[in-house]
Amino acid sequence: MIRNITLGKVNNIRKSIILNVLASISNLIPFIALAKIVETLFLNRGADSIDTSLLWKYFGIMAIFFLITFLLENLAAKYTYELGYKTSADGRIELADHIRKLPIGYISGKSSAEILDTLMNDFFKVETAVTHQLPQFISGICVAVLCSILFLIVNVKMGIATLIGLPISVLLLTLMQNFQKKIYLKTKKMRIKEEEDINEYLDAIKTLKAYNSLDDTLTKLEEDIDNSRDANIKSEKGVGSLTTIASMILRIGLPLMSLVGSYLFINGSLEIDTFLMFLFVGTRIFDPLELALVNYTGLQMASVSGERIINLLKAKPMSGNFDVNESNKIEIHDVSFSYKESKVIDNVSLDINENELTAFVGYSGSGKSTLIKLISRFYDPNEGTIKIGGVDLLTADPDKLMDKFSVVFQDVYLFKDTIYNNIKFGNENASKDEIMNAAKMAGAYDFIVKKDDGFDTMIGQGGATLSGGEKQRISIARAILKNAPIILLDEATSSLDPENELIIQEAISNLIKNKTVVVVAHKLRSVMGADKIVVLNKGKVEEVGKHEELIKNEGLYKDLWNYQEKSKEWKIVQ
């Protein structure tokens, strides 16, 4: 459990635990001194004089250890909080960096809400455990053990009476571990589902308005939120009731100790000083013990969160440490790939020559975009090999490999930042002149400078404040700025209006000069001049050749061409 909570770094918390244990022990000593003061006053109640020096000695001990406790608690708190927040912050950075190195296939298999829940809520649980729950739990247990030994040495009967509820409480909570874990996992699953639905509701708000489906979707969202609420209430009731029962059983020791002590004292079997020690010190151990029991439940939840974080950190990153060669020839040999059970690429072999334009065409679902993602190592093939410059992608250093690529997708993602910084994302070391020039080559400069803040204009998250054509041009500008030798274009103009399409086609022409280019084409006319056109059908290579050759073959490519030519005649009629 402790290993999960500390994310495998148990040694980091030792100092914090030791300081908290010392503070708890130090906090007990003034009450032992108080018991001795009361004993002295009680034993000398009929005497003519009392040894005040002895009383001052006990008062001095109380004052000194109250001060020591204060210093230890402050030192422990300072160290614990620094450690907890540092563990959480460093852990989030480590996990974010680790996610960057994971295959896209692994990440796409998880929802963004699930990963975000781990980065935020799971780390918050771990943070709370390290800063509060774990030190209090361990110091409470240590105090209980030390006091138990002391009590049993001083008086076995009183010791048993005081601590009789402790093993029962611990046994109860131990037996209910799986129940607590099951409840916590269920509530976490409901919360992730709720977060997913809220994100989907916000992302789809325009579509929902267009179809007047807001009420129906809101009703579904309300159901999910209500289910999450009910699961949390049920969890709190179940775990809370369990903790309350355990605390009640633990505190049975207090009245039982008083009852047994009174009986033994009346019968002369217990000295007054021993009875007073149990009354003063015995009552003090119940607070840290009860706090330990309460924290135990929280630690169980934090342990589950820590386990989720560790499991994500254990996810195997993309392998490879070999340098990539200067050659940019792409060789695909007997490659097959499946999304779960569905085979998308089936035994494809293909050579893509350096400094040539190769186009992938075919019906929707034929594997065009998937092949692009395999080349850029967003996914790894299930079978076969892909090489660039003779180096197998699986053995190439992932960061150095990605330096070879500039990728322009149909769906462009822009960051919530200025236009300038979004373009600079292509090359963080680029000068202002280089960024301006990239914008001009991408056909983006004119529309940028017309905006009130020009290049300093803030973009909404995902580029929400820009048109599709504007987003695409900024995407091409940062690809130009990166100046990678291999360009991958995934239907970059398929959803644009004619004016934007023409501008972006000119921008792409600037981007791909003297590069190795692979393009997924929706409109066949845009790739008529390609050096090589690869026709894909159901994940297999159907035809390969230039436009004129493929038309003469009268195969699938010609069928696609005829369909597109015929579609020009289509009109909306009523």
Where are these regions (language model features)?
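Hydrophobic alpha-helical segments in the permease module
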Residues: 58-73, 166-170, 239-253, 272-294
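Short intracellular "coupling" helices and adjacent cytoplasmic loop segments at the cytosolic face
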Residues: 85, 93-117, 121-123, 197-220, ...
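Hydrophobic/aromatic residues in alpha-helical transmembrane segments
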Residues: 30-34, 76, 80, 95, ...
